[in-house]
Design a protein with these regions (language model features):
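Conserved SAM-binding strand-loop segment of SAM-dependent methyltransferases
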Residues: 50-56
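Short, Asp-centered acidic motifs that coordinate Mg2+ and/or phosphate
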Residues: 32, 67, 147
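C-terminal helix-rich "cap/oligomerization" subdomain common to oxidoreductases
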Residues: 2-3, 67-69, 268, 274-275, ...
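N-terminal Rossmann-like dinucleotide-binding module
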Residues: 1-47
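Glycine-rich, N-terminal phosphate-binding loop of Rossmann-like dinucleotide-binding domains
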Residues: 71-72, 152
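Contiguous C-terminal substrate-recognition/catalytic subdomains in enzyme active sites
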Residues: 232-298
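Beta-strand-loop-alpha-helix segment that lines the small-molecule cofactor/substrate pocket
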Residues: 67, 73-74, 78-125, 140
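Predominantly a Rossmann-like dinucleotide-binding segment in NAD(P)-dependent oxidoreductases
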Residues: 117, 124-228, 232-249, 374
Length: 379
């Protein structure tokens, strides 16, 4: 089996969450990384016996690297992806793809000019339960898809943040960090082009001056519509509705209420650094693996409501309720590697390519504009 050599641009929190997948999947090898923090570079060298560079330019110049995983701060995604393409590498880019449609188009053009793949992820539209829901919709067994309801209440805004993560202009807040998940999911389920959006946003804490909440109504060609609601204000936790299974498929303690806000009483940058790769607070290995989720999701067809959960898809039909079970994942987020490997090794076009991700960002930008201008936006 051919192994893909991966170089990581940015050893922050995104890499901490993706590292277990990259380390466990035999189809990929973590060969090199770039990060300005010496302690993170040293940790990478110890953990993976790889090469570590201080700059992304140096990483892209490494001829052994085939794919650059761009996990740098959002404002640098376009620059670093284009650096990878200029060096003849493929790029796997964390969401959000970029901070403007002009940047998205530049990334797509650079990938095409280089003859390399641009894949954007992880997003929760990769999740096996979401994809299985799409298969059930596409089967036609339950009639046409009419409505999608997506809701998620978390502590997102009160997790430790760098200053730019609380600045919308630099890619901070829920519209750049969380809405791409929601929009990707409903676009995948709808299987049609989004045509209109009307949104409202909330920024209710002056100490964290970015959008912490949003609600949007999204219309698709063919008449399907979706409602998206998200709050990151660390009050209600919608994992209560998913059996206390968290976003990463981990079992959660319902008695740990308020822990995120309480932790912020300390030094925020110290807390941020210990959560980054090389810090003392790394994602815990779950005692049992379950599929990831992004809150409550219900796809309403003419003859059934379909609800993906951590272990399968519940089908609420005209006369019966049953579950379509899914086997537990062997490796979390393996679906990302499936798509990357199929593209790079087998030459199969990826679903989450540049145009797909740009269409998702077009909706996210329109949500911001709709809330600002207080009107519906045509896409």
């Amino acid at each position: 089996m051919r192994t893909i050599a991966i170089g990581v641009a940015g050893l922050g929190r995104a890499f901490s969450l993706m590292a277990p997948t990259l380390a466990a999947d035999p189809r990929v090898r973590l060969l090199a990384a770039a990060d300005p923090r010496a302690e993170a570079r040293a940790q990478f060298e110890r953990d993976f016996a790889g090469r570590a560079y201080a700059t992304v330019d140096q990483l892209c110049a490494d001829r052994s690297v085939e794919v650059v995983y761009v996990a740098t701060p959002h404002e640098f995604h376009a620059e670093h992806a284009q650096c990878a393409f200029a060096a003849g590498k493929h790029a796997l880019v964390e969401k959000p793809m970029a901070l403007s449609m002009a940047e998205c188009r530049a990334m797509i053009d650079a990938a095409r000019a280089a003859g390399r793949h641009l894949i954007v992820g992880h997003s929760h539209s990769y999740d096996a339960p979401v994809r299985r829901t799409r298969e059930l919709i596409a089967s036609g067994k339950y009639g046409r898809l009419r409505m999608i309801t997506a809701l998620n209440f978390t502590d997102f805004l009160y997790r430790p943040r760098r200053p730019e993560e609380l600045d919308t202009a630099r890619g901070g807040g829920t519209l750049y960090n969380q809405a791409p998940h929601h929009v990707d999911i409903v676009r995948l389920l709808a299987g049609a082009r989004a045509v209109r959006v009307r949104a409202h946003t909330g920024a209710w804490d002056a100490a964290r001056p970015t959008e912490g909440a949003y609600s949007a109504l999204l219309a698709f060609d063919g008449g399907t519509f979706a409602t998206l609601t998200y709050s990151g204000y660390a009050h209600f936790d919608s994992d209560e509705f998913t059996g206390w299974i968290g976003e990463s498929g981990q079992e959660k303690d319902p008695n740990a209420y308020g822990a995120t806000r309480t932790a912020l009483a300390g030094d925020e940058m110290t807390l941020k650094n210990v959560r980054n790769y090389g810090g003392s607070q790394q994602p815990k290995t779950p005692t049992r693996l379950l599929h990831q989720n992004f809150g409550v999701l219900i796809a309403s067809c003419e003859h059934a409501d379909l609800r993906p959960l951590a272990d399968g898809v519940w089908i609420y039909g005209d006369r019966e309720k049953r579950v379509d079970p899914l086997a537990a994942p062997a490796v979390q987020r393996a679906e990302v590697i499936d798509e990357l490997y199929a593209a790079v090794v087998d030459g199969r076009p990826p679903l989450h390519d540049g145009p797909w991700a740009a269409a998702t960002m077009e909706v996210c930008f329109a949500m911001l504009r709709s809330a600002r201008e207080q009107r519906e936006i045509e896409l």
